[in-house]
């Protein structure tokens, strides 16, 4: 059974504190938009789909609390301004991930339309917000399952031409239940392969410097008893070169996909794409349509978040043999004191290195002109 990283029931929100994984599984309450902002900024929750969901639901919890306490204004205009201000605030917690900004924009549009209605009140606006927020959680899970099915089918069809009915895949960072409402994007593809008894082995990178692969992806893979091997980031080239491993595909997630297919994802993704091209391994991006930013023409326009030098120069964890219900984390220095550090959280993989983008509506490959064209994915949304 997949992990449930986000629990939302009866207007209460809890998330797994990912800073304590894989040593302790603890759910922490999110009671306000401010709680949501800090949970995202401090990376207690991460993954582009998950942070958008937590942001929107954190405000839902706060709105419900205000309403329950009898402090909600009857004016839809006043409540609308409050919601929009909070949405803008939440977007500042993680600027690179397009899902958060996209969700905030959609909810802002919903608020604006609702306040224009003649019978609109503060109470009806909050009710509409809560309904849409809950649907967002449901839709994300369904979308991830579709991504998994489409991606597994695409990989297996190509493996079959090589006489393979089981495949080895490599993934980077964490794109599973801990990064989404459930199931996952890139890890969802791997889950689907495993469910079809078509996964021979998944290799996951440790994903320095924040170690999401070692801490989170490995945690999910062990939890679900998948055949898995952890490697350091710098071992990927040797793995792809080994004939015994025969990696069929590298599958990664995305924080933002530009209109031309350039993809911003966890630092180290670009390097894997270069290695895949050299070794003739398919390189796939798995992401919902909400991650595709048609307003950003190329990857050069994507703002890359830079994080604290301490993430590179130190490492955190409990001392070996001292893991219990109460986690006592230690910080260990790795680097020479005084060394300068550059710590971009993401890099941008050029579309030329990407073989396909897997979405909940299907797999998009490059056209005959050598470019990605995503417009057809959104035609249904525009007409519905």
From Swiss-Prot:
Recorded name of the encoding gene: mri1
Cell location: Cytoplasm; Nucleus
Residues annotated as catalytic: 255 (proton donor)
The entry's keywords: Amino-acid biosynthesis, Cytoplasm, Isomerase, Methionine biosynthesis, Nucleus
Pathway: Amino-acid biosynthesis; L-methionine biosynthesis via salvage pathway; L-methionine from S-methyl-5-thio-alpha-D-ribose 1-phosphate: step 1/6
Protein known as: Methylthioribose-1-phosphate isomerase
GO cellular component: cytoplasm; nucleus
Keyword Calcium belongs to the record: no
Organism: Talaromyces stipitatus (strain ATCC 10500 / CBS 375.48 / QM 6759 / NRRL 1006)
Enzyme Commission number, as recorded: 5.3.1.23
Family, per entry: Belongs to the eIF-2B alpha/beta/delta subunits family. MtnA subfamily.
Gene3D superfamilies: translation initiation factor eif-2b, domain 1 (1.20.120.420), Translation initiation factor eif-2b, domain 2 (3.40.50.10470)
Site keyed Transition state stabilizer: positions: 173
Annotated GO MF terms: S-methyl-5-thioribose-1-phosphate isomerase activity
Cited function: Catalyzes the interconversion of methylthioribose-1-phosphate (MTR-1-P) into methylthioribulose-1-phosphate (MTRu-1-P).
Catalysis performed (reactions): 5-(methylsulfanyl)-alpha-D-ribose 1-phosphate = 5-(methylsulfanyl)-D-ribulose 1-phosphate
Domain of life, source organism: Eukaryota
A Gene Ontology BP annotation from the UniProt entry: L-methionine salvage from methylthioadenosine
